Amino acid sequence: MSRVTLSRYLIEQTRSHNTPADLRFLIEVVARACKEISHAVSKGALGGVLGSMGTENVQGEVQKKLDVMSNEILLEANEWGGHLAGMASEEMDSAYQIPGKYPKGAYLLVFDPLDGSSNIDVNVSVGTIFSVLRCPDQYLTQNDSLNEQAFLQPGTQQVAAGYAIYGPQTMLMLTLGNGVKGFTLDRELGSFVLTHDNLCVPETTAEFAINMSNQRHWEPPVKRYVDELLAGKTGPLDKDYNMRWIASMVADVHRILTRGGIFMYPRDAREPSKPGKLRLMYEANPMSFIIEQAGGAATNGTQRILDIQPESLHQRVAVFLGSKAEVERITDYHLEG
């Protein structure tokens, strides 16, 4: 049987699910950019790309050389194709305007160019997260600058989302709203090849991912839930759990997508005015879309993440996602107060 490449899969989606050709072309361009980022990441010290730039992004985080390089790769790959009305990146203060010399399209691309970049120098898996939205009609102009408001759509409006993970293999996980597919980069062929069909997150789990060093800062519902997990068979859940924490959202969520579990990044007492650490637009929404399409669930503790109306490009949010039964349990604990 011939192997199904990403290009072939997208063409088949156009035929069977009426996926617009412009969206197909956009996904292929993003995938090519991810291949280029993968190549740069794999070179590491040999390519002179490790270490920091000595600058900070809008989040106040120190930018790694590969953060900046990955951001530029995605911008340059996607700005000229005519598929996009604009882009927004975690590494940039404001929306990226498509240069006037290029035609504009009907979509918006939102991305975290290199998630988990604090792990780059120690050779731990990192990745690229992206989300595709339709640009509202009132913002579809060829000449005017794109207003940030065009991007502020709830996650339910995403038409596609995915992530590339750069590990022992480079993989692209993708949803177009009809399930989740996984593609592995065949470096000899130079293409992403379908290797994981209709991924499904198990409803129950025996694994959880959370940064335990922050335990003293958690809110009571999170402390209660994690205490029950740690109690194992002797506790109310009557089951032993294992903890896994990589400190790279892409890597942690990838494990949960492929074998189950719950990922937690709660708000805490250190910054009580902030509703969480992770970015709604660049991380939480695309990952929640993927997890839900695989049969899992994702909330901020009290509300489905995909239902949250964004108020700003860099809005933060608490995240609980993964196996449905566990996400529902900790959400219930939050709602009980």
From Swiss-Prot:
The protein's annotated pathway: Carbohydrate biosynthesis; gluconeogenesis
Record InterPro entries: FBPase_C_dom (IPR044015), FBPase_class-1 (IPR000146), FBPase_N (IPR033391), FBPtase (IPR028343)
GO biological-process terms attached to the record: fructose 1,6-bisphosphate metabolic process; fructose 6-phosphate metabolic process; fructose metabolic process; gluconeogenesis; sucrose biosynthetic process
Cofactor note: Binds 2 magnesium ions per subunit.
EC number per UniProt: 3.1.3.11
Any one cellular-component term (Gene Ontology): cytosol
Protein name as it appears in the record: Fructose-1,6-bisphosphatase class 1
Tree of life domain: Bacteria
Annotated substrate binding sites: 115-118, 211, 277
Family under the similarity heading: Belongs to the FBPase class 1 family.
Alphabetical list of SUPFAM superfamilies matching this protein: Carbohydrate phosphatase
Binding site for Mg(2+) 2: 112, 115, 283
Signal peptide region: none
Any one GO molecular-function label of the UniProt entry: fructose 1,6-bisphosphate 1-phosphatase activity
Assembly and binders: Homotetramer.
Binding site for Mg(2+) 1: 90, 112, 114
Primary localisation category: cytoplasm
Cell compartments where the protein resides: Cytoplasm
Cofactors (names): Mg(2+)
Catalytic reaction(s) noted: beta-D-fructose 1,6-bisphosphate + H2O = beta-D-fructose 6-phosphate + phosphate
Keyword tags: Carbohydrate metabolism, Cytoplasm, Hydrolase, Magnesium, Metal-binding
